[in-house]
Structure formats: structure tokens, C-alpha cells
Amino acid sequence: MDGTEGSVGQPGPTERSHRSSVSSVGARAADVLVYLADDTVVPLAVENLPSLRAHELHCAVREVLKLPDIALDVFALWLVSPLLEVQLKPKNQPYKLGRQWPELLLRFTSAPDDDVAMDEPFLQFRRNVFFPKGRELQIPDEEVLRLLYEEAKGNVLAARYLCDVEDCEALGALVCRVQLVTYQPDWPAACDLREKLDSFLPAHLCKRGQGLFAALRGRGARAGPGEQSLLNAYRKVQEVSSDGGCEAALGTHYRAYLLKCHKLPFYGCAFFHGEVDKPAQGFLHRGGRKSVSVAISLEGVHVVDSREKHVLLGLCFQELSWDHTSPEEEEPILWLEFDRDSGVTPVNKLLKIYSKQAELMSSLIEYCI
């Protein structure tokens, strides 16, 4: 599609329903707002906004943030709304694409007409889906690392990057180390963590207890299981980061967080929305469909059950063949063909993903291969 790098998908943790990236427009000048992953706003005064290209805005953001040249490869400009995400090519004109947003929603989403009419995208400066994650840890600039860290943290907290409990606690401990003071055995950290737990752990791991026991626990009481596990993980991080009494630089903790995220299969992915057939249940019951997220990176494809938040399928590109079809008057389909070991001989499998973004997913897979 003209206007994207194939990385169009469902919105992530930074989605906002009442944002706009054009705060005012004069005869020649305009105030453009570009959002960072941590919700910081970068205001830009630009001229000839309708003809301005993404590359020019990208350079302006880098200049304001005083980022090194490597940021040109690491980050990209995205148009983001609650309904759709689009990574822009350098030659794209963001203002023009913003005006075409309803057409993009109709083409690539199944959103109701009322939602399409109300939706408005904003500009975001965030990770380029085509930047190899192996190069990140070689970056010396602390501000670049911080921006990558903030984006990864947001994806973990929003459960977009699925993690087991142990990984979530280890990542949460690194966030504690960045945000809070040095751990001390007599520090009343349980209270502090209890109040800020959703800043360190995904929502499903930090739901506060309900009822009488929660009321009796009080602010000065002992930490609950989630808080205590996070405290224990935080203490381990502190012990590792202290070297002869000298605290490690923030860049070290950013790298540690990113390195941990690199082990997650979803890091650096573009996310798409689709549906797959449910297995038929019983003689008279039709299977129906279930909603899925399709995560595509430079390394492979993962299909995630959107409701249950678990991985249905994970494949490296060497393990699959793919195609997409767009039958007339039917939903486009992305086909994934792969082998699975049945215990004796490999069995050929075929997964059918119904999605208006099938063509985009196919194009991204082709690019990555």
C-alpha cells in the first residue's frame, strides 16, 4: 500500500482516542505534536505542512531530542489511533495520510462506521519494525536506549509482549531499579510498590486483593505475594548492579531490560488483527471463529489468542510457506503452511487467517524473508 512499509496493524499500549498531532494551522506555519512512547510530547513549528514528508519531520524530532544519526535507522514515524497503526515511509506525507485516514480504516479494518467517523490518528516517534534487535545493544547513546526501553516497557505492561510470571517480575524489578531508590532491608518498599504496582507489572499480575483481608492489611502491613516477589527480584537486581558501592549507570539497566525483552518472541513485531476458525466441538456444534493477533518480526510469525492471551502458533520463516488470497465478496485470507511432528512422521498443516490486513501481512513476510 502506498503510505506504509507493510506494518499496518492493531493498536498497542500507546493508543489514545482524543489526540491530535496538528494543534494549530496558520497561513503558512503549523504546530505539529509528535508523541513519544512515554507520552512525552515533542512540539514542532513547521511550514508547508501538507507537503512535508515523514523524513523531514523525523529529522526535526531528532534535532529537538539531540539524538545521534543512528536514530534515523532505529526509529520511524507512525500514524496511530485506537483502530489502526501505520509505519510511515520516509517519502510519505503525514498530513495527506491523516486526511485519508477514513479510507484506510475502511480498507484495513472492520470498524463500524460511527467509530471510523470519530477516529483521529496522531504521530508517534517509535521503534522501526525493520531495525534488527541485535544492533540495539551496540548503541552507546543513553537517550536512544531510554526511548527503546520506554516503548518495550509499555508493551510489557499492556501484555502485548506476553511473558511468564518470572519474566514479568524480573522486568518489573529492572523498572523499579530505574525509577526508585536503592533497596534497603528496612525500606518500607511494600507500601510504595503497592501504590505503584501497575507501573511495574502487567494488570493481570497486580490486581489488588478485595474484601476483608485487603482492608485489614493496611499501608503498613507486610507485602502481598505479588509485591513480595517483586521486592525479591528487585533485591537481586540491586545486588548485581552494585559493584564495590558504585551504582551502575541507567544505560546499563536499559540494556538489561532490552536484552531480557529480546528473548521474547514478540519484541520488535508489527501486530495485525485477524480471526481463525475454532475447532468443531461435537456433532451439532459449529466451531465459529476466535480473534487473534498476528505478530510478525524479522525472525518469524506468531499467532496469539487475543482473548486468552496465549500463543497458538510460533514459526520461524524457514518453517513456513505462505500466501494470501482475496476472493470476491469474501474476506481476504492469509494462509500459513507448515509441518508438525505427529510422533511418527511430520504432518502438513494449513492455518487460515481471515483478515482485511492479509495483503499487508503477506508483504511484510516477503520483505523479512
Curated annotation (Swiss-Prot):
Alphabetical list of PROSITE patterns matching this protein: FERM_3
Encoding gene (name): FRMD8P1
Domain FERM span(s) in chain numbering: 30-369
Highest taxon of source: Eukaryota
Family annotation (SUPFAM superfamilies): Second domain of FERM
Record region (Disordered): 1-23
Annotated PANTHER family: FERM DOMAIN-CONTAINING PROTEIN FRMD8P1-RELATED (PTHR13283:SF12), KREV INTERACTION TRAPPED 1-RELATED (PTHR13283)
GO biological process, one term: negative regulation of canonical Wnt signaling pathway
CDD domains to which the protein is assigned, alphabetical: FERM_B-lobe (cd14473)
One family name in Pfam for this protein: KRIT1_FRMD8_FERM_C
GO annotations of cellular component type: cytoskeleton; plasma membrane
Protein name: Putative FERM domain-containing protein FRMD8P1
